[in-house]
């Protein structure tokens, strides 16, 4: 399997619960390296631009409002099959449907406040990583 990079965001609900370290431990325990990381409080403009693909969807305003409601932790994960591995760690979008032991099953409250975001494909990951991290700020190790 190829070495990949994927974007991960720990959303405001999980940051507020003080579980960043527990989530990072899961990434590292699965063999993923954190090669870039920063905390940010997204502006409305940044959240709208990042989630622009969902602009026509009925949940867009609520998603943006939620993502700007508090700080988020944004990281780039690197490793073999990182995109799928991270999606497996996250679990289903709806925490009620997420498998026991996944990040969303353990830390999310609802389909809206679902603890984490992860890129869904290589093309998306490249765009999302570039959105938050200029290449010079990502370090393979």
Swiss-Prot record:
Binding-site list for ATP: 11, 59, 87, 93, 104, 114
One example of a Gene Ontology biological process annotation: CTP biosynthetic process
Entry superkingdom: Bacteria
GO CC aspect terms: cytoplasm
Molecular function GO terms recorded: ATP binding; metal ion binding; nucleoside diphosphate kinase activity
Class of the enzyme per the UniProt entry, highest EC level: transferase
Entry similarity comment: Belongs to the NDK family.
Function description: Major role in the synthesis of nucleoside triphosphates other than ATP. The ATP gamma phosphate is transferred to the NDP beta phosphate via a ping-pong mechanism, using a phosphorylated active-site intermediate.
Name recorded for this polypeptide: Nucleoside diphosphate kinase
